[in-house]
């Protein structure tokens, strides 16, 4: 839907959200949720595609948020513009339509921020047990990567020269006032405040949209009698592969099932039927999959990395948070089997606070959005 240009007499300003159109991940969904909440609270809002995504098709699954898409030239200079943390520059001509002082940055993640001090923050500042780094598969991947790197070097250099030219002459770096930062997680808030020695910024989380999931007809995913562990191979596969090797060496007692190439109903079925959801990666923010898992009564076992180090983000008992700085792969596998031995019902009850926190996300988010609107009215 294309937004009409609103008359300034009806509203002092609109809240414009620059979002990647056509991308289905946690960040873009949060932006749609924000847009929807603002509209529900009676304030005008507009989604504007990030540069390079204008011609993409809007994600069909996000139609439930009633998105109103517009163009950058539909904005007014008194509009508030919210951008994601990964956006460090904008085309110069954008600033004919928007004001720099009205830019707000939403830190949906820490480690994927355009700002150098935040990039890969977790991996740079918190190491894992060296045994995780001795994986022969990793060495092979590095070898292959080096070979590919040589082949791609010429093309990369050409692209780099173009990017340098574009950034210098065609784009403008974005500098955000500390007071104009919004934080999706306690992890983002605390890292930002520690690095910048400030108490500035406002919390603006998101929520896990598990409404009506129970009404979806769930296919039977697996009928074997083994314990089932769901995992997301697109994240931390180099670590998970070591666990899979250990499991195979012990006769494959556990059935590890990847969340990969599945329809939404299949993901729901897998998480509903699994005894555990395992994630050994770092959490640049409050990742959705662990929250979706617990909303489907699937216990989680997470690496204590990134946002998982903060109780405010993941209120889990310590036995469900794996300290990979101390635990090697063998010890981690033992911890996994120990958790499984407790049984799904026990683990679910032990994680009741996490489940309650996830259930309370939406009303909390609406309250945060309402608070943000009130702050902006006095901006």
How would you describe each model-predicted region?
Residues 264-274, 295:
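Short acidic alpha-helix that forms the nucleotide-activated donor recognition element
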Residues 1-80, 301, 308, 320-321, ...:
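N-terminal pre-catalytic "stem/leader" segment of glycosyltransferase-like enzymes
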Residues 18-22, 50-51, 82-88, 108-109, ...:
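Structural motif
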Residues 29-30, 163-267:
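Conserved catalytic-core segment of nucleotide-activated headgroup transferases in glycan assembly
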Residues 2-5, 16, 54-135, 139, ...:
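Extended catalytic core of nucleotide-activated donor transferases of GT-like folds
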Residues 282, 288-359:
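Catalytic binding pocket for nucleotide-activated donors in carbohydrate/polymer assembly enzymes
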Residues 272-285:
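Acidic donor-binding loop of glycosyltransferase active sites
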Residues 76-78, 177, 272-273:
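Alpha-helix C-terminal capping/helix-to-coil transition sites in glycosyltransferase folds
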């Amino acid at each position: 839907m294309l937004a009409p240009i609103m008359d300034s007499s009806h509203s002092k300003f609109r809240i414009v959200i620059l979002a990647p159109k056509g991308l289905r991940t946690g960040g873009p969904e949060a932006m749609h949720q924000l847009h929807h909440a603002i509209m529900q609270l009676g304030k005008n809002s507009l989604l504007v595609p990030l540069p390079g995504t204008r011609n993409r098709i809007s994600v069909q699954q996000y139609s439930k948020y009633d998105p109103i898409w517009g163009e950058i030239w539909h904005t007014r200079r008194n509009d508030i513009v919210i951008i994601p943390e990964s956006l460090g520059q904008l085309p110069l001509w954008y600033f004919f339509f928007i004001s720099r002082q009205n830019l707000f940055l939403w830190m949906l993640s820490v480690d994927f921020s355009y700002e150098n001090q935040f990039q890969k923050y977790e991996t740079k500042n918190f190491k894992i047990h060296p045994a995780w780094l001795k994986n022969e598969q990793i060495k092979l991947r590095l070898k292959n990567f080096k070979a590919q790197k040589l082949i791609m070097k010429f093309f990369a250099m050409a692209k780099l020269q173009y990017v340098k030219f574009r950034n210098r002459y065609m784009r403008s770096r974005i500098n955000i006032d500390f007071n104009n930062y919004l934080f999706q997680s306690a992890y983002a808030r605390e890292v930002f405040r520690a690095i910048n020695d400030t108490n500035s910024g406002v919390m603006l989380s998101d929520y896990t949209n598990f409404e009506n999931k129970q009404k979806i007809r769930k296919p039977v995913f697996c009928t074997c009698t083994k314990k089932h562990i769901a995992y997301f191979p697109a994240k931390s596969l180099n670590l998970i592969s070591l666990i899979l090797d250990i499991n195979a060496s012990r006769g494959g007692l556990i059935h590890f099932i990847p969340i990969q190439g599945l329809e939404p109903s299949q993901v729901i079925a897998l998480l509903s039927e699994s005894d555990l959801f395992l994630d050994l990666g770092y959490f640049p923010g409050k990742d959705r999959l662990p929250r979706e898992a617990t909303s489907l009564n699937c216990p989680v076992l997470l690496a204590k990395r990134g946002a998982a180090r903060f109780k405010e983000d993941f209120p889990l008992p310590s036995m469900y948070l794996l300290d990979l700085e101390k635990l090697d792969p063998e010890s981690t596998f033992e911890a996994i089997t120990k958790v499984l031995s407790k049984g799904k019902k026990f683990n679910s009850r032990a994680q009741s606070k996490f489940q309650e926190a996830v259930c309370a996300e939406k009303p909390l988010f609406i309250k945060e959005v309402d608070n943000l609107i009130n702050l902006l009215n006095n901006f």
